[in-house]
Amino acid sequence: MEEKKRELIRNLIAEGYIKRKEVAEAMMKVPRELFVPEELRHMAYEDTPLPIGAGQTISAPHMVAYMVEAAELRRGDKVLEVGTGSGYHAAVMAELVGPEGHVYTIERIPELAERARERLKALGYNNVTVLVGDGSKGYPPAAPYDKIIVTAAAKRVPEALLKQLKVGGIMVIPVEEEPGYQVLYKIIKTPEGYVIKKLLPVAFVPLIEEE
Protein backbone atom coordinates (compact mmCIF):
# COMPACT_ATOMS: atom_id res chain seq x y z
CA MET A 1 0.00 0.00 0.00
CA GLU A 2 2.70 2.50 1.02
CA GLU A 3 4.59 1.87 -2.22
CA LYS A 4 1.41 2.38 -4.28
CA LYS A 5 0.75 5.60 -2.37
CA ARG A 6 4.29 6.88 -3.00
CA GLU A 7 3.96 6.09 -6.69
CA LEU A 8 0.62 7.93 -6.89
CA ILE A 9 2.10 11.01 -5.22
CA ARG A 10 5.17 10.93 -7.49
CA ASN A 11 2.82 10.86 -10.49
CA LEU A 12 0.73 13.76 -9.15
CA ILE A 13 3.91 15.81 -8.73
CA ALA A 14 5.09 14.88 -12.24
CA GLU A 15 1.67 15.81 -13.71
CA GLY A 16 1.74 19.18 -11.93
CA TYR A 17 -1.22 18.58 -9.61
CA ILE A 18 0.96 18.73 -6.51
CA LYS A 19 3.21 21.80 -6.37
CA ARG A 20 4.01 22.30 -2.69
CA LYS A 21 5.89 19.74 -0.65
CA GLU A 22 3.39 20.33 2.21
CA VAL A 23 0.63 18.95 -0.02
CA ALA A 24 2.69 15.88 -0.92
CA GLU A 25 3.44 15.31 2.77
CA ALA A 26 -0.21 15.73 3.79
CA MET A 27 -1.38 13.22 1.16
CA MET A 28 1.39 10.84 2.20
CA LYS A 29 0.17 10.91 5.80
CA VAL A 30 -3.53 10.22 5.15
CA PRO A 31 -4.47 6.53 4.65
CA ARG A 32 -6.94 6.82 1.74
CA GLU A 33 -7.60 3.06 1.96
CA LEU A 34 -9.44 3.68 5.25
CA PHE A 35 -11.81 6.15 3.58
CA VAL A 36 -13.09 3.79 0.87
CA PRO A 37 -15.34 0.70 1.18
CA GLU A 38 -13.42 -2.42 2.16
CA GLU A 39 -14.03 -4.18 -1.15
CA LEU A 40 -12.40 -1.24 -2.98
CA ARG A 41 -9.35 -0.87 -0.73
CA HIS A 42 -7.07 -2.42 -3.34
CA MET A 43 -7.98 0.57 -5.58
CA ALA A 44 -7.33 3.24 -2.94
CA TYR A 45 -4.19 4.55 -4.65
CA GLU A 46 -5.44 4.51 -8.22
CA ASP A 47 -6.10 8.04 -9.44
CA THR A 48 -9.84 7.61 -9.76
CA PRO A 49 -13.02 8.58 -7.90
CA LEU A 50 -14.65 5.68 -6.02
CA PRO A 51 -18.22 5.14 -4.77
CA ILE A 52 -18.66 5.48 -0.98
CA GLY A 53 -22.40 4.73 -0.73
CA ALA A 54 -25.51 6.94 -0.67
CA GLY A 55 -24.87 7.86 -4.32
CA GLN A 56 -21.72 9.81 -3.38
CA THR A 57 -18.06 9.41 -4.32
CA ILE A 58 -14.60 10.05 -2.91
CA SER A 59 -12.87 12.43 -5.35
CA ALA A 60 -9.90 11.26 -7.40
CA PRO A 61 -6.60 12.04 -5.65
CA HIS A 62 -5.53 14.44 -8.42
CA MET A 63 -8.67 16.52 -7.81
CA VAL A 64 -8.09 16.63 -4.05
CA ALA A 65 -4.50 17.76 -4.67
CA TYR A 66 -5.61 20.33 -7.25
CA MET A 67 -8.27 21.82 -4.97
CA VAL A 68 -6.07 22.11 -1.87
CA GLU A 69 -3.32 23.67 -4.01
CA ALA A 70 -5.81 26.16 -5.48
CA ALA A 71 -7.07 27.06 -2.00
CA GLU A 72 -3.50 27.82 -0.86
CA LEU A 73 -4.10 26.19 2.53
CA ARG A 74 -1.69 27.30 5.24
CA ARG A 75 -0.98 26.28 8.81
CA GLY A 76 -3.43 27.94 11.17
CA ASP A 77 -6.17 28.40 8.54
CA LYS A 78 -9.81 28.03 9.55
CA VAL A 79 -11.46 26.12 6.71
CA LEU A 80 -15.05 25.33 5.78
CA GLU A 81 -15.65 22.28 3.60
CA VAL A 82 -19.04 21.75 1.98
CA GLY A 83 -19.63 18.04 1.30
CA THR A 84 -17.71 15.83 3.73
CA GLY A 85 -18.33 12.58 1.86
CA SER A 86 -15.85 10.02 3.17
CA GLY A 87 -13.86 12.60 5.17
CA TYR A 88 -10.68 12.03 3.13
CA HIS A 89 -10.51 15.58 1.78
CA ALA A 90 -11.01 16.96 5.32
CA ALA A 91 -8.17 14.77 6.62
CA VAL A 92 -5.76 16.09 3.96
CA MET A 93 -6.79 19.66 4.82
CA ALA A 94 -6.42 18.94 8.55
CA GLU A 95 -2.81 17.88 7.92
CA LEU A 96 -2.21 21.13 6.02
CA VAL A 97 -3.74 23.53 8.56
CA GLY A 98 -2.14 21.72 11.51
CA PRO A 99 -3.27 21.65 15.14
CA GLU A 100 -3.40 25.45 15.23
CA GLY A 101 -5.93 25.44 12.35
CA HIS A 102 -9.41 23.91 12.13
CA VAL A 103 -11.57 22.27 9.46
CA TYR A 104 -15.36 22.53 9.73
CA THR A 105 -16.97 20.13 7.27
CA ILE A 106 -20.68 19.84 6.47
CA GLU A 107 -22.45 16.77 5.06
CA ARG A 108 -26.18 16.56 4.36
CA ILE A 109 -26.35 12.73 4.48
CA PRO A 110 -26.29 11.75 8.18
CA GLU A 111 -24.89 8.22 7.66
CA LEU A 112 -21.91 9.58 5.67
CA ALA A 113 -21.29 12.28 8.27
CA GLU A 114 -21.37 9.74 11.10
CA ARG A 115 -18.95 7.39 9.31
CA ALA A 116 -16.59 10.27 8.48
CA ARG A 117 -16.75 11.53 12.07
CA GLU A 118 -15.83 8.10 13.49
CA ARG A 119 -13.03 7.61 10.97
CA LEU A 120 -11.47 11.03 11.54
CA LYS A 121 -11.70 10.61 15.30
CA ALA A 122 -10.09 7.15 15.16
CA LEU A 123 -7.22 8.63 13.13
CA GLY A 124 -6.71 11.39 15.70
CA TYR A 125 -7.92 14.38 13.67
CA ASN A 126 -9.06 16.51 16.59
CA ASN A 127 -8.90 19.64 14.44
CA VAL A 128 -11.89 18.55 12.30
CA THR A 129 -15.54 19.15 13.21
CA VAL A 130 -18.09 17.17 11.16
CA LEU A 131 -21.54 18.78 10.95
CA VAL A 132 -24.81 17.56 9.43
CA GLY A 133 -26.77 20.07 7.39
CA ASP A 134 -27.24 22.02 4.18
CA GLY A 135 -23.71 23.05 3.27
CA SER A 136 -24.89 25.70 0.82
CA LYS A 137 -25.85 27.77 3.88
CA GLY A 138 -22.34 27.41 5.34
CA TYR A 139 -21.81 27.36 9.09
CA PRO A 140 -22.21 30.89 10.50
CA PRO A 141 -21.21 30.10 14.14
CA ALA A 142 -17.54 29.59 13.14
CA ALA A 143 -17.42 32.21 10.35
CA PRO A 144 -15.56 33.97 8.86
CA TYR A 145 -13.29 31.40 7.20
CA ASP A 146 -9.84 31.80 5.65
CA LYS A 147 -10.69 29.19 3.02
CA ILE A 148 -13.87 27.50 1.77
CA ILE A 149 -13.77 24.35 -0.36
CA VAL A 150 -16.93 22.98 -1.97
CA THR A 151 -16.91 19.40 -3.25
CA ALA A 152 -20.23 19.47 -5.12
CA ALA A 153 -21.25 21.54 -8.14
CA ALA A 154 -23.46 24.58 -7.53
CA LYS A 155 -25.74 26.19 -10.11
CA ARG A 156 -24.41 29.50 -8.79
CA VAL A 157 -22.06 30.45 -5.98
CA PRO A 158 -24.15 30.43 -2.77
CA GLU A 159 -24.44 33.94 -1.31
CA ALA A 160 -24.17 32.57 2.25
CA LEU A 161 -20.73 31.12 1.50
CA LEU A 162 -19.43 34.37 0.00
CA LYS A 163 -20.59 36.20 3.15
CA GLN A 164 -18.74 33.73 5.40
CA LEU A 165 -15.40 34.14 3.59
CA LYS A 166 -12.83 36.52 5.13
CA VAL A 167 -11.50 39.42 3.07
CA GLY A 168 -8.33 38.00 1.51
CA GLY A 169 -9.87 34.53 1.78
CA ILE A 170 -10.17 31.99 -1.03
CA MET A 171 -13.09 29.80 -2.08
CA VAL A 172 -12.69 26.88 -4.47
CA ILE A 173 -16.03 25.72 -5.89
CA PRO A 174 -17.25 23.80 -8.96
CA VAL A 175 -19.98 25.75 -10.79
CA GLU A 176 -22.33 24.29 -13.39
CA GLU A 177 -22.15 27.01 -16.04
CA GLU A 178 -24.57 25.19 -18.33
CA PRO A 179 -26.29 21.79 -18.08
CA GLY A 180 -23.62 19.09 -17.99
CA TYR A 181 -20.71 21.55 -18.02
CA GLN A 182 -18.93 22.38 -14.76
CA VAL A 183 -15.95 24.64 -14.19
CA LEU A 184 -13.82 24.88 -11.05
CA TYR A 185 -13.75 28.49 -9.80
CA LYS A 186 -11.19 30.07 -7.49
CA ILE A 187 -12.78 33.10 -5.85
CA ILE A 188 -10.66 35.59 -3.91
CA LYS A 189 -12.54 38.03 -1.68
CA THR A 190 -11.11 41.55 -1.85
CA PRO A 191 -12.09 44.72 0.04
CA GLU A 192 -13.80 45.86 -3.20
CA GLY A 193 -15.54 42.59 -4.09
CA TYR A 194 -14.34 39.37 -5.67
CA VAL A 195 -11.77 38.17 -8.17
CA ILE A 196 -12.87 35.01 -9.99
CA LYS A 197 -10.43 32.71 -11.76
CA LYS A 198 -11.79 29.86 -13.85
CA LEU A 199 -9.43 26.93 -13.43
CA LEU A 200 -10.57 23.88 -15.40
CA PRO A 201 -13.59 21.77 -16.43
CA VAL A 202 -14.61 19.25 -13.75
CA ALA A 203 -17.29 16.66 -12.96
CA PHE A 204 -18.79 16.66 -9.45
CA VAL A 205 -22.05 15.44 -7.93
CA PRO A 206 -24.58 18.31 -7.69
CA LEU A 207 -24.76 20.54 -4.61
CA ILE A 208 -28.21 20.03 -3.12
CA GLU A 209 -29.59 23.29 -1.78
CA GLU A 210 -32.62 23.18 0.48
CA GLU A 211 -35.13 25.93 -0.18
From Swiss-Prot:
Enzyme superclass (EC): transferase
Reactions catalysed: [protein]-L-isoaspartate + S-adenosyl-L-methionine = [protein]-L-isoaspartate alpha-methyl ester + S-adenosyl-L-homocysteine
Lineage of source species: Archaea, Thermoproteota, Thermoprotei, Desulfurococcales, Desulfurococcaceae
GO cellular component terms, A-Z: cytoplasm
Purpose: Catalyzes the methyl esterification of L-isoaspartyl residues in peptides and proteins that result from spontaneous decomposition of normal L-aspartyl and L-asparaginyl residues. It plays a role in the repair and/or degradation of damaged proteins.
Active site (record annotation): 59
E.C. no: 2.1.1.77
Family per record: Belongs to the methyltransferase superfamily. L-isoaspartyl/D-aspartyl protein methyltransferase family.
GO molecular function, one term: protein-L-isoaspartate (D-aspartate) O-methyltransferase activity
Keyword S-adenosyl-L-methionine included in the entry's annotation: yes
Pfam families (alphabetical): PCMT (PF01135)
The entry's keywords: Cytoplasm, Methyltransferase, S-adenosyl-L-methionine, Transferase
UniProt protein name: Protein-L-isoaspartate O-methyltransferase
UniProt record, GO biological process: methylation; protein modification process; protein repair
Compartments, as annotated in UniProt: Cytoplasm
